[in-house]
Amino acid sequence: MVKISEIARTSTFAWSSDTLPILATGTVAGAVDASFNSSSSLELWDIFSATNTNEPIFSAAVEHRFYALAWSKPFEGRPRGLIAAAFENGVIEFWDAEVLIISKDLAKASVHKSSKHSGPVRSLQFNPLQSHVLVSGGSHGQIFIWDTKKFTEPFSPGSAMTPMDEISSVAWNNSVSHILASTGNSGYTSIWDLKSKREVLHLSYTGASGRANFSHVAWHPTKSTELITASDNDACPLILTWDLRNSNAPEKILEGHKKGVLSLDWCQQDPELLISSGKDNTTFLWNPTTGQKLGEYPTTANWAFQTAFAPKVPDIFATASFDGKIVVQSLQDTSPPVSEKVTSNDDNVFWNQLSTTDTQQPVFDIKQAPQWLKTPSAVSFGFGSKLVQVSKDSNGKSIINIQKFVAKGQSSSSELYTALKNNNFKSIIDEKISSNVASDLDKSDWKLLQKLAESGKDEILTEVTTEEEEKKPETEIESEDKKNGDSEDVPASADDSFFDNLGNGKVVLENEAPFVPSGSFKIFSAKVSEEDKSLIKLVLGNKIEDAVHDCIERGKLLEALVLALDASDDIKEKVKNAYFKKNVKKEVSRVLYSVSSQNITDIVSNANVANWKEIAAGITSFTNDPDDFNSKITELGDRILESKTVADSRDTAIRCYLAGNALDKIASIWLKELPALEAHLLESDNAENVSSPSEARLIALTNFVSKIAAYRSISNISGEISGPSAEPISKAIVEYTNLVAGNGEFELANIFLQLLPSDLAGTEKDRINKATGAVAAVTASKTVKSGTSAVANSVTAKTSKVSREVSSTPKPSYQATMPPIGAPLAPSAIPSASVPSSNPYVRASNPYAPHVSSTNIYKPAAPVVQAPPPAQATAVSPPPTGPPKPVYKQETDGWNDLPDTFKSKAPARRAAAVVTATPSPTPLPQTTVPPMSIPPGPKRSMSSGSAAPPPPKGSRANSKVAVPTIQSSPRPAPVHVNNRYAPPPSADVNAPSNTHSSPVGVSPSTKKNPYAVAPEVAPRVAYAPPPASLSGLGFSGGAAAPPAPPKNPYAPSASSVISPRVSNAGIVPPPMGRGIVSPPTSFGSMHAAPIQPAFSGVPPPPPAIGHQPAASAPPPPPAAKTPVPTKSKYPKGDRSHIPEKSVLIYQYLTKVLEAVKPNIPEKYTAHGEDLEKRLNILFDHLNNEDLLTDDAIEDLKEVCTALESKDIESASSLNTSFAANHIDQLGNWHRGITRLITMAEAMY
């Protein structure tokens, strides 16, 4: 129940028949309010108004009070129906509802007023089948039928069998318009037939508790022979259902009211819902068909004398009571509990809120959905062009029908698939060109594709660039030839030579003799100028360079060019530059410049695009490199497309793009035209098969991808779509593949998905692969958790691209030397005191777990001893060759986890075939189990030359290979800083067994505690010490005790750890992970035990604790002292000493936190407080400068900057990188930043 409105009136009411109904109220007769006010008013209320529902939209005073109100459905001449009022003085008045609402004038809206009744009128109802017919009943047993169209004299339905003193209720039959029922204080309910004008039947009931005194009657919404009556007798407060075919006794008796029932209403939209109210101040919801009470709504302070559903909104009903309220509420209860309404922690405020809060909630005994919320029939499209239909038979049972659905336009997709398989688009091209449905632009595109298929891309430009020459008339050519004198110089015998050289634009005649001067001449004649004399002297003196320079200075470029012909290249360039500088504004000079330099970039970029044909001819003539040609012709297409001076710029640009293999450019144009093509398909008279926008969209997308496929086939283009427009094109193709895949054409969808980059269509590819069963075989392995009893070989796998690169699983290079998966591993000649080691470069999959290498760098060079074969091999998937990508999500779901409100709704990713090898973070006591065999790793070939792999990209700067320093004794354990915010160190380690014994038994890991934080990362050392002794070392069966962990404020108290004996403190026991160490990787570094320390970052041995071991072992070093906690420089909460380099982190995080806090739901307040606490831990570290390095601070600044600028995606990515690169500096504070990013994402 949701209380929609509460009207402070003691009034009767009537609903309008509008979709959002209006409520009419009239002051009820016979009631006295607290002020003893005797006035009366008619009011209209817009309950669903968005502005103000506390005030009526109309109110007018009337002389007398009301017994009943009725509001008819719209009918002829009354668009919003009539309002009829029954007054206590026997008057019935009618108002036009529309006039009343618009004019707000009661007198103007009044259409009729009658005093036909001789006493008070108790009940009114309009006929549901004939909206203009009204029945009224009142005192003295008077019942009248009114025609509100003509307002003629009302008539009586006839004489009653048993006279009644007062009619309390009248009701029309909902199926037969001339049948009505009436009931009164005589204890009878009469059935009237207006056609025969007589009472045909009357009903009465006498039970064990007495005689029923009927107060209300209502007909079944759909069955003409069933009705229901209510008794207001306190001794017999019953609701009776009747079937007139057996009127001797009621069909059902509904018991539940403690006192008399005053009102009921049978829902017209659901015959299985009935609402009633009465003298016991209650309102009940019933199923009258079964006779069961469904629920009870909050009680009132006085009699609830009327209740009724809204005619067009049956989920809403109103109840009027004598406590001065009309409550409008909903059937369903969606209100929050009282505990959420009253939220104050202050006692005084709590009781104040409680006193003003509606604490009553409806109580439902039986949950039953209304008929309008049930689905009598349903239909749904299924994946693969399936259509599922659900319907009901005559017995109400569901019938499910699944059939194949063939969408319009699906035939085009089938033709496209055939063309793709045969690599032949000729039929599709011909069909598109001849189609009556295609637009002109679409046809022009297909014609270009046809020319491209027939002639090639070279001919596409050639036919355009040679059009004008072909159109030039022969007379014009001849006149030009005569003008130039060329025709006289070409004899008939030179025809062959002429045509051979015609393509070069010049004619060289075979018998043309070279120029040879003859006759005498003067070197210096009288007409020779001094300038020419100087030039002649320079030339004759073979000073060609000076002569050229002189010619250039005097502007004699012709002579300079002749002199430069046989000169050096520098002189030629000098002359050319002089020429171009002098004729810089001449068009021919710009063209000659590009031609002489064999680079037409200037022409392509700067020439007027109106001369695009000449530009295209130049590109064709002077560009020999295919990539350069494609680039320049595509640039020309861009300029044409942007130009407004070129006719048919769109088609011309596409022609250039086709010639330049610029598929992304062409597809961008086609993509922009998709909406226009869809509109054309919907408006075209020839497109008879297109009847909806979805069909037009499918046809347009099919046409789009068909063009792309045809062009790629014609141009022999392979590979994925790329370029600046790859993303929008890919989205359109993905949309098309979703449509055709939904029609069951998975092969066609898969073909087009292969054209798209994986980062844009990876999910769709997986979806199609699953549907077709073509998922690549990937060996799956179950993740071994820290609490399972099974022991498996643990493999840390790379999982960065598992969800997309399913079909490209690399094969490990060690495959030939390793037994098949699931087969027992051959025993290796390795010391039995060790277990197969891990790659020291591989990080733990949990970023909060300590980075511990399982390679024992302190292990002595022991003699090779053959280990016993394993009893049972464990099947694992082959590990990839690279280090893993860290995974930062912890599936703990503890009290401190982020609430679901803030979790992003990302689709579930497929689990990777990974077995993680992470030390257990919980320092709980170990359970001793009998030793069991560990399958040793395969023997490493000495001739393979395998070396440890380099660290992964992005690894920490301090993870470098360090040269070990030889020391005489093992280095003592480092003193840990007692930081209450840092996670505790790992306590789960295994001790090596006796050298000649079977492999050590492994204790089962304890279950991960969801409330405990990740363990502390041990401090790193630059140089690892060598072992104290390399011979004669024996081991006892005990394990080295871990150092005492610092107090963790977030973890529950744990039992004390049993400290077993240790035989040699100089040996670092391998860490206890979640099972036996995995097989080797292809580099062979995960199981090789080095002779001497070679890597930094390996934790030193823990302090020796326990009793003195066997006499053969050297005495252990003294136990380390308890770490002394280091006091912070500044108190907690101090922010005044945050250095300048870190203050930006503090400012940005504080700003985002203050923006997020007001939006945190109240029930997640604890999460918000925990978030702030974690950030304060970081701020304390920044203030004390005791945790983060400068590199870490800079990386964290990038995270905070992205978060402050609301770039959530970048912030999340940078935060992940930060955790991977600075794992040794993480703590409880980092979880706070991760949670802040997620909360900010939910808010923004």
Swiss-Prot record:
Biological process per Gene Ontology, one example term: positive regulation of protein exit from endoplasmic reticulum
Bias kind Pro residues: ranges: 868-886
Compositional bias annotation for Polar residues: 794-816, 991-1007
Swiss-Prot/TrEMBL WD repeat ranges: 5-46, 61-105, 116-156, 162-202, 209-252, 256-296, 299-339, 380-403
SMART domains: WD40
PROSITE patterns, per database record: WD_REPEATS_1, WD_REPEATS_2, WD_REPEATS_REGION
Gene3D superfamilies reported for this sequence: 1.25.40.1030, Functional domain of the splicing factor Prp18, YVTN repeat-like/Quinoprotein amine dehydrogenase
Keywords linked to the UniProt accession: Cytoplasmic vesicle, Endoplasmic reticulum, ER-Golgi transport, Membrane, Protein transport, Repeat, Transport, WD repeat
Subcellular location(s) per record: Cytoplasmic vesicle, COPII-coated vesicle membrane; Endoplasmic reticulum membrane
Region feature Disordered, mapped onto this chain: 460-495, 794-820, 868-1007, 1066-1136
Stretches with biased composition (Basic and acidic residues): 469-486
Domain of life of the source: Eukaryota
Membrane topology: Peripheral membrane protein
Compositional bias segments (type: Low complexity): 909-919
Reported function: Component of the coat protein complex II (COPII) which promotes the formation of transport vesicles from the endoplasmic reticulum (ER). The coat has two main functions, the physical deformation of the endoplasmic reticulum membrane into vesicles and the selection of cargo molecules.
PANTHER family per UniProt: SEC31-RELATED PROTEIN (PTHR13923), SECRETORY 31, ISOFORM D (PTHR13923:SF11)
Family label: Belongs to the WD repeat SEC31 family.
Summary of subunit composition and partner proteins: The COPII coat is composed of at least 5 proteins: the SEC23/24 complex, the SEC13/31 complex, and the protein SAR1. SEC13 and SEC31 make a 2:2 tetramer that forms the edge element of the COPII outer coat. The tetramer self-assembles in multiple copies to form the complete polyhedral cage. Interacts (via WD 8) with SEC13.
Stated name of the protein: Protein transport protein SEC31
Phylogenetic lineage: Eukaryota, Fungi, Dikarya, Ascomycota, Saccharomycotina
